[in-house]
Amino acid sequence: TKKYPASMYDRMVTEMGADANAYTTDDYTAYHMSFTKDDLEKVVEIESDRFQNLSYEEAAFQTEAGAVYGEYRKNISSPWMMLNEKMQATAFTAHTYKHTTMGFEADIKAMPTMYEYSKSFFTRYYRPENVVLLVAGDFDPAALMTMIRKYYGPWTRGYVTPVIPVEPPQKGERSATVSYTGKTLPILAISWKGERFD
């Protein structure tokens, strides 16, 4: 952000001795940090600033986009990853679950040209209506709520729920074969769709 540029954010996290990371599933992205309770207010402040005021240059975005493509290429060197990608593409014909968390290769390759889209994605999805804030450990709950109101309170609402295509009922078996150029024993994967989880 303008207040906490990437180098400053990284330095602060390191100086706190905090452990920060993130992961993405088909349904959400989670950002997590472990730190001492003495740093609780600073963490609440810098994280609220990051999620409300993220700012990054196009060159940095393009570098990161290249790293994402490298990760994708590494992942598909695994027959299991290729199998999972094909499984999702076969099981779903309309719903966004059709692609893996990383997405389709053509989209990932084009990512360096999607700087403006990345900013609109952030503006659209990173809204207070979409946030779940969890804090666990030794802290004063009343003091924490005061901090949350102070740092997250001004965040402007404005999320517009996207239209997610409804997956039509599957009428029969679907099958697919994955071509894999590396060496592996044969792998068979069988999946069933379950009920929607709300």
Which residues does each PLM region occupy?
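M16/insulysin-pitrilysin zinc metalloprotease superfamily fold
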Residues: K3, S34-A65
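Non-catalytic, conformational "gating/processing" segments within enzyme and secreted inhibitor domains
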Residues: A65, W80, Y115-Y151
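Acidic/histidine-enriched alpha-helical segments
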Residues: T14, S55-R73, D140, Y159-G172
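Histidine-acidic residue clusters that define the catalytic metal-binding segment
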Residues: T90-V131, V163-E167, R196-D198
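His/Glu-based metal-binding/catalytic segments typifying zinc-dependent metallopeptidases
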Residues: R73, V160-D198
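Buried hydrophobic packing residues in well-ordered domains
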Residues: T1, V13, Y31, E47, ...
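M16/MPP (pitrilysin/insulinase) zinc-metallopeptidase core fold and M16-derived inactive scaffolds
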Residues: T1-M33, H99-G103
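Short beta-strands and strand-coil junctions in structured, solvent-facing domains, enriched
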Residues: N53, E57, P141-A142, P154-R157, ...
